[in-house]
Amino acid sequence: MPSKGKDKKKGKSKGKDTKKLIKTDESVVDRAKANASLWEARLEVTELSRIKYRDTSRILAKSNEDLKKKQCKMEKDIMSVLSYLKKQDQEKDNMIEKLKQQLNETKEKAQEEKDKLEQKYTRQINELEGQFHQKAKEIGMIHTELKAVRQFQKRKIQVERELDDLKENLRNTERIHQETLRRLESRFFEEKHRLEQEAEKKIIMLAERAHHEAIVQLNDAGRNVFKENDYLQKALAYHLKETDALQKNSQKLQESHTLLLHQKEINDLLVKEKIMQLVQQRSQIQTLQKKVVNLETALSYMTKEFESEVLKLQQHAMIENQAGQVEIDKLQHLLQMKDREMNRVKKLAKNILDERTEVERFFLDALHQVKQQILISRKHYKQIAQAAFNLKMRAACTGRTEYPKIRTFDGREHSTNSVNQDLLEAEKWTHIEGNVDIGDLTWEQKEKVLRLLFAKMNGCPSRKYNQSSRPPVPDYVVSDSGETKEFGDESKLQDKIFITQQIAISDSSGEVVLPTIPKEPQESDTGTF
């Protein structure tokens, strides 16, 4: 019997649990429906705000497109004005260059009358340069104004960029705000769900405990009252939670509404500022256009005046050029006469030089012959002196005589007894009086005589020869060893004695003609010396 009572109690408790589960499922469904209706209302509100923002963005895009079209038109007009002004400047520069070229040509043609005409042309050129500087200043003013327009355009672009940056910042802030809201909402719902689960678990635990205690203590009527009280408490807690959530959502919506109103006010202010700036820009562009028109009229008037002055100057220059051309023809005729006279003088000078070159060749051949004789005689003297020295040394070796003084034959500088000292004695003019026959002189003295004759014939001052110096020998003379030797600077200076090697004659064609003198003198008969 007690086992049957226990089974009945267990069946009753299971039925009660199923009823409670059904009730909790119904409450969850009701909550889900309430949440769905709430989110639908939110979605409708956001859709309405999105439609409004779309309309405003379309209106702003249209206004931006209109402003861009106007800006492009204004830029095209400004570029056309700039190109027209640049073309006019280029044409003026070309005209100025042509006039300068014409002036240079007139100066080249009239070289001799340059001093007379220079004063007139300088005055006229100064006047033209003054006008040109004035025009350049005016053009510079135009350029400065155009630069101001360009700076204004650049400033406009910068302001537009700043607007775009502000819009992007606003969008970023909105996006960040929405993300933070989403995060907070997700956290809130997670915490809410977790707390609800914990509360439900605790309530279930408490309810089970209370239920068991109530079942034990109360009768049927008390049990019904307890159940109703429990149900009412749950409903009240649920409604309180819903009211808290609705209050929080209403606060968030109010905050977002205030933010949107603030952004709208900022956008309205920015649009008003841009409209004011566009109005100012239009007024400035109109004033600049008026200035450009006035400057164009002034430039056209000044160009006409400049062209008329240029025509007058060209006519005056043509008349003066014709007069100068007549005088140039006369001078050219005189120059031709002078050229003929110069050609005659050149022919005479050439004939004289040809005759002189023959004499110089004769002297060169004589000098060459004398130098060769000097070399031969010196070589022969060295051989005889060396043979005599060798004989004395042999005799001294046998003991018949004493040893002679040491003598050198290679011409060393520090030698005290050299053969070259005997050779230098031949150059000295000792024991020679007036009316000397040239056949009685040595070969070295004959060479000096020939050089003095050359110097006197060419009008050059006679040079003093150092008696201790080596006798001059030309570069082409062969020494004892069969090799060519270069002797000092006198062999180079002797080539500068001759007049035919110093004077260059130019004929009428402008080419330089030098007399042909051979470097190596030809052998001639020098029997007279």
UniProtKB/Swiss-Prot annotation:
Domain of life of the native organism: Eukaryota
Keywords: Cell projection, Cilium, Coiled coil, Cytoplasm, Cytoskeleton, Flagellum
Residue segments, region Disordered: 1-22
Chain segments annotated as transmembrane: none
Pfam hit, one: DUF4515
Major subcellular location class: cytoplasm
Protein location: Cytoplasm, Cytoskeleton, Cilium basal body; Cytoplasm, Cytoskeleton, Flagellum axoneme
Regions annotated as coiled coil: 85-201, 271-361
Sequence ranges of Basic residues compositional bias: 1-13
GO CC entries: axoneme; ciliary basal body; sperm flagellum
Biological process annotations from GO: flagellated sperm motility; motile cilium assembly; negative regulation of microtubule depolymerization; protein stabilization; single fertilization; sperm axoneme assembly
Record's function text: Plays an essential role in sperm motility and male fertility by stabilizing the sperm flagellar axonemal structure. May be required for the stability of ODF2 and MANS1 proteins. Dispensable for the assembly and function of motile cilia.
Family recorded in the similarity comment: Belongs to the BBOF1 family.
Assembly with partners or alone: Interacts with MNS1 and ODF2.
Protein name: Basal body-orientation factor 1
Gene name of the encoded protein: BBOF1
